[in-house]
């Protein structure tokens, strides 16, 4: 059995990690760490765990993670790297769900976040986008779990970038997310009366995930590229739907795209290519799947891609567990086979 600790276990992502790991046949949770819920049991703070688990939250101390083989760190950027360093120093595999270990370019990270305190650890880390970076994940002690928006966008674009089928500076990503992506901390802007029956764009031209998407897309394309990314907030709890536009550099039709995407993702269980219809949020809600569909606008020779994920699962906790499965040589699907919550 793999022994797991979760730091930052009382937030939305932390609780989702607990829920998913409890159903994993090869994992035992040995500690759940949260200063805000210290000494409370999970079935008291989250009654959905009644008769399932009575794990007790505790404050962080090295002893709390000493028994673990893997440490999941679900803390905000900046704070997280301190705990990742501690876990690394005592020989633990650390899967970090903040932005702190997603970048290879320190300047990109510093521009959108802050100066990294442990830049030497970036060379020890792998970007945890499972379908793209599997071999690096297998060999890394620190795995930087991708952001939710980047997961949806990069996987939607990867086959076209790898095959150099689009104009590298024509990419526009228009993503819509459920409110859980903002986290558990209260903010009036995310309150019911502000969101219900509303729909809005935010952080236009300056969302932090833009640089993460650009860095990874540039790697796939083999050259630096610039793109436009605009996030929107939907009045739903969970899910991301990205509509991605790019100019094709040669004449190809939808049948060609079906062949290209199916070939690129032929061995990827969690990627579902929609050939005859377009994905919807309800198909992926509660799952680790990425649903991808597309059309070609023949008038403009532009491709339009639809990419859907559950932001808390494939965009966070589920992908972190998929990374753990890869790292510990388990079946990648273990603990993650789920049918979407249709209603």
UniProtKB/Swiss-Prot annotation:
Keywords carried by this UniProt record: Amino-acid biosynthesis, Arginine biosynthesis, Cytoplasm, NADP, Oxidoreductase
Top enzyme class: oxidoreductase
Short name of any one Pfam family annotated for the protein? Semialdhyde_dh
Which residues are the active-site ones?
Answer: 148
Molecular function (GO) terms for this protein are: N-acetyl-gamma-glutamyl-phosphate reductase activity; NAD binding; NADP+ binding
Keyword Cytoplasm carried by entry: yes
Indicate the principal place this protein occupies in or around the cell: cytoplasm
Q: Name one GO biological process term.
A: L-arginine biosynthetic process
Localisation per UniProt entry: Cytoplasm
Q: What is its EC number?
A: 1.2.1.38
Q: Which Gene3D superfamilies is this protein grouped with?
A: Dihydrodipicolinate Reductase, domain 2, NAD(P)-binding Rossmann-like Domain
| Pathway the protein contributes to | Amino-acid biosynthesis; L-arginine biosynthesis; N(2)-acetyl-L-ornithine from L-glutamate: step 3/4
Give the reaction(s) catalysed. N-acetyl-L-glutamate 5-semialdehyde + phosphate + NADP(+) = N-acetyl-L-glutamyl 5-phosphate + NADPH + H(+)
Q: Fetch the SMART domains from UniProt.
A: Semialdhyde_dh
Q: Which GO terms describe its cellular component?
A: cytoplasm
Q: Which family does it belong to?
A: Belongs to the NAGSA dehydrogenase family. Type 1 subfamily.
The role this protein plays is: Catalyzes the NADPH-dependent reduction of N-acetyl-5-glutamyl phosphate to yield N-acetyl-L-glutamate 5-semialdehyde.
What name does UniProt use for this protein? N-acetyl-gamma-glutamyl-phosphate reductase
